[in-house]
Design a protein with these regions (language model features):
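Nucleotide-sugar donor-binding catalytic core of glycosyltransferases
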Residues: 2-266, 279-295
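Catalytic binding pocket for nucleotide-activated donors in carbohydrate/polymer assembly enzymes
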Residues: 239-357
């Protein structure tokens, strides 16, 4: 079997694309041993169809100046001789690219709405949570954006969960390894960190929440601004340099990780590595793989309207010894999928099963 993956040639500088391609490169030997040949292609030509399966990265399409022409080209070339997969590598669960969904065979996304019928509704801000803040608090975006709803319900059957950004490396030196990979292209640099701090480590700080609050859309920044305001009497939420930030994480019992452009955040996985207990807006509306988010088992949740936020934090602070097992569970799960003995095999099997569907 031959698979072509169409993506930008500087994919290592785009966090979403790099997170998507990372586990493929990491497991490439096992994938090849299964009889699958993978080629990375960075430009449009008829040769991209010389395969059994063509995977197109959404970030490649996002930078095209003539996207409509490219879509028409794909439609014209599409045959039953190969499978066409569109990989939506954005880190949020919303805003489907309906122009591609309409004609590709399969639509991959790292995280999707649990109720896929929601994709048939327009969402203010392009996400379910931004739509919530518009409806609940009448938050208005200066740069207004509304997601394009899916009009044909049958198209929802094309949507499949692939894998999320958690499989990428989020260790202390991940950014350096990413830079070195961009220069030398050695797969040696594609490996998840094995350096982590156990939850049992002595921690002198109760809470860490170092977050940015400036976003182009008010419905995205709203949650972060409100959380910063609710915490300002207790902790400093301003951002730190990377190493100071990571040192603080490893010394903190709880790490609060709000939504950003997407629901998933690198901070979630930095929390697991550093042995903190993740506190995050409720993720019950989302399906993803691996599923890092099981409330009261791998993280503590609070409601999107933030009404119970302070109380949740207060209860957590009083019960750290009892709740610490949640951090243990989360770290165990994270290490299982990233550096566990079977981690490459687990990903390879998932990748091949997705391809064969």
């Amino acid at each position: 079997m031959k698979i072509n993956i169409l993506l930008n040639n500087n994919y290592f500088s785009d966090h979403c694309t790099f997170s998507f391609i990372y586990p493929i490169i990491k497991s490439i030997s096992l994938i090849r041993e299964s009889g699958v040949k993978i080629s990375f292609i960075h430009s449009i030509s008829n040769s991209i169809f010389d395969c059994n399966t063509l995977i197109i990265d959404s970030r490649f399409c996002g930078k095209l100046k003539k996207k409509t022409e490219f879509i028409n080209y794909l439609k014209k070339k599409k045959t039953k001789e190969y499978k066409l997969i569109f990989a939506d590598t954005a880190d949020n669960s919303g805003q489907l690219k309906t122009d591609f969904l309409s004609f590709v065979d399969i639509y991959w996304k790292g995280q999707i709405l649990k109720n896929v019928n929601e994709y048939m509704n327009p969402h203010y801000g392009g996400r379910l949570f931004t739509n919530f803040y518009k409806k609940r608090f009448n938050i208005q975006d200066k740069n207004k954006q509304i997601s394009e709803p899916v009009k044909n319900k049958d198209l929802l059957n094309k949507i499949q969960i692939c894998w999320n950004m958690g499989l990428c490396d989020h260790g202390r030196y991940a950014h350096i390894k990413q830079k070195l990979y961009s220069i030398f292209k050695f797969n040696f640099f594609i490996n998840n960190t094995k350096n982590f701090f156990l939850p049992d480590k002595k921690r002198n700080r109760n809470i860490s929440c170092r977050i940015g609050t400036k976003y182009e859309r008010e419905t995205v920044s709203f949650q972060r601004i409100k959380i910063s305001e609710l915490l300002e009497k207790y902790i400093d939420t301003s951002k730190l340099s990377r190493f100071k930030y990571l040192n603080e994480l490893s010394n903190s019992k709880y790490i609060i990780s709000p939504f950003g452009w997407g629901e998933l955040c690198p901070r979630d996985f930095e929390t697991f590595i550093n042995g903190g207990l993740l506190i995050k807006p409720d993720m019950k509306t989302i399906n993803t793989w691996p599923n890092w988010y099981v409330s009261n088992k791998t993280y503590l949740s609070f409601d999107w309207d933030l009404i119970n936020f302070r109380n949740k934090v207060k209860i957590a602070l009083k019960n750290y010894k009892k709740l610490k097992e949640i951090a243990v569970n989360a770290q165990r799960e994270y290490l299982y999928y990233t550096v566990g003995k079977e981690s490459k095999q687990i990903f390879t099997e998932r990748f091949l099963n997705l391809i064969k569907k």
